[in-house]
Structures are given as C-alpha cells and as structure tokens.
Amino acid sequence: MTAQEQMAGNTDENSANFDCGIVQTKQKLHNQYFASTPAISLRVDNVEYVYATLQFGKRKDKIFMYIQIADKNVCIEKDKVLDIFFKSGEVVTFKNDFALNCEGYFAKQLSKKDYLKVKENEISSIKIYAYEKNYELYVSEAQNYDIDNQLNCLAAYKVKKTDEVKIKKHKKEEKNEPASGT
C-alpha cells in the first residue's frame, strides 16, 4: 500500500483518493434529501467589498448550482439570466429557477449538457443580472479546479435517506460496544 493510499484510508483503485467535503444533513428541500459541496467565495469585480458564494448541490440524481451575492437588497427575479464566460470565449446563459427574492439567490438545475459544459471548460467570469445592478464575478484557476472537483464528487455521490445513515451508524456503534459483564 502506498503512502497516499494510507493517508487517504482508501485501498479501492476505483475510488477517488481525496475528501470531497460533501455534506448531507437531516433537512429536506422540497421533501427530498439533498447533499451540498463547500461554498466557493468569488470576488465581485465591479462592486467594492462585495463577494458571492458559489455552491453545488444534489437532490436525487439532479445537480444544482447556487450563487448568492453578499450585498444589500440584491433582488433577482425568477427567469432572470446569468452568463458564464469561458476562457475559450464561449458564453452560456442560464435562467434563474429560484423564485423572486431580494437576498441575492440564483439557483439553476443543471442539465447533463449544462453540467458537462461547466465541468469541461474553464470559467473566466460569471455575470449576474439583478434587478437594480449587474454583478461580475471573477473565477480564478484554483476556483476552476475546485468547481471541477466538486462536480466530479457530486456526480459520484449517492444522496442517502437520512434514516439509512442513522441505521448504519447505529449498527456500527453496536458492533463497537464492549460486551457487558464481569
């Protein structure tokens, strides 16, 4: 066993040898269990001291992209668009699936084609068209790597029913309990 395998604690050749950081809680979204990746902080280029968070999530077999702009009164309407600019010069436009909100939330369920486009191409910037102002988000090379890694992780991740997780954990605890007696 190599040092890398020992550190990762994984001897299966077909598994990824890195921690994806995927979190699944007991909460449900639209009555379905979901999992999410760690948020990636993106700098807003055209507004000082403003950041946005990019996060991916999964419900059933569907992958979602969420962006929240951390600024006051950022109203984004349902079906308002977001443009992703790739380093190749190509631009992809997504419509907001989330209801009208003034908390700066943009959500998009990624189709297989959308997923592949975002995963296989380096993003240079993202532009969100809010009600009163447009926000331009810069995406670095390191953030592109994180995006690719998180999409790979989510694609392979199976969302569990939280009850199944509890049962497995409970069975594991029972095995580890010492036998009672003197």
Sequence positions of predicted segments:
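Bacterial Sec-dependent N-terminal signal peptides
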Residues: 1-8, 180-182
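An ectodomain-focused feature that recognizes extracytoplasmic/extracellular
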Residues: 5-72
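Residue-level detector of beta-strand face positions
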Residues: 41, 81-83, 125-127
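Generic structural motif
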Residues: 47, 57-59, 70-74, 87-89, ...
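Residues at beta-strand starts and edge strands
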Residues: 48, 59-63, 78-80, 104, ...
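Mid-length scaffold segments of soluble, non-membrane domains
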Residues: 62-95
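Internal interaction segment
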Residues: 88-182
